[in-house]
Every structure is written in structure tokens, then in C-alpha cells.
């Protein structure tokens, strides 16, 4: 939870059980479930972690994960935008589709510095989270 100015070298304790993570303010990180191989799990439950401090955007790209159908346009994207002043994350309308794409999914939205995790049921249309 410490804040550091950029452009410096930091010596940090990093035992094998704890790896330090440094993330630029105004970043959006998406995390899927732990899997052993790409198509083991349908990624219908995704964590979205917002590191506030500046406005941010991220394009969540998804495809079947096990073939080249993305070259034929079989993929989807979901835009994510963080408005730092309003403290609002907008999960935009999904574009595109692919075989086996989950039509509904759960996003667990965590804004760093706020202990609350917001569970959002997303069905492809724009939704805002504060």
C-alpha cells in the first residue's frame, strides 16, 4: 500500500512467499482464475483491479484460446475506463463474438484503497461502477 515516485530503484524485501508488486497509478489489471492450461476453464469470473490516481483505460480482449479463429474475426473486446475524478469505472458494451463466449459473466471490481469488492453481473451492455 505504499506510494513511490517513479524513476527510482527500490530495494524491497522479497521472500519466496511474498513478491512485491509495483503498479503505475491509473492502471487497470484483469485477473482470471488459476488454470493449468488455456482452455481448462471458461473465464466467466474475472477480477478487475483498479489502481486509482489518474484516468485509465483498458481493452479486455478474448477469443477461444485454442485456435486461429481470431484471424477470421472471432473474438470480442470490452472497453474498461476509469474516471479518477468521479471515482467511476465504466465497463463498456462488448464488441464482437466467438464460439463458446460466455453471454453473462461476473466481474469482481476492486478499487485499491477501498476495501469493498463490487460483484457485477455483466451481460454485454455498458455498466458503470462507483
Question: Model regions: which residues?
Answer:
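Intrinsically disordered, low-complexity linkers and stems that provide flexible hinges
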Residues: 116-130
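Catalytic core of carbohydrate-active enzymes
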Residues: 1-115, 124
Amino acid at each position: 500500500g505504499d506510494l513511490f515516485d517513479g524513476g527510482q530503484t527500490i530495494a524491497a524485501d522479497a521472500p519466496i512467499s511474498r513478491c512485491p508488486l509495483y503498479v503505475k497509478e491509473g492502471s487497470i489489471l484483469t485477473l482470471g482464475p488459476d488454470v493449468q492450461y488455456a482452455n481448462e476453464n471458461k473465464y466467466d469470473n474475472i477480477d478487475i483491479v483498479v489502481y486509482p490516481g489518474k484516468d485509465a483505460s483498458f481493452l479486455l480482449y478474448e477469443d477461444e484460446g485454442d485456435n486461429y479463429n481470431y484471424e477470421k474475426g472471432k473474438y470480442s473486446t470490452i472497453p474498461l475506463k476509469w474516471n479518477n475524478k468521479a471515482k467511476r469505472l465504466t465497463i463498456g458494451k462488448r464488441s464482437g463474438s466467438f464460439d463458446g463466449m460466455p453471454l453473462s459473466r461476473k466481474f469482481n471490481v476492486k478499487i485499491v484503497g477501498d476495501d469493498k469488492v463490487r460483484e457485477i453481473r455483466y451481460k454485454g451492455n455498458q455498466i458503470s461502477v462507483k
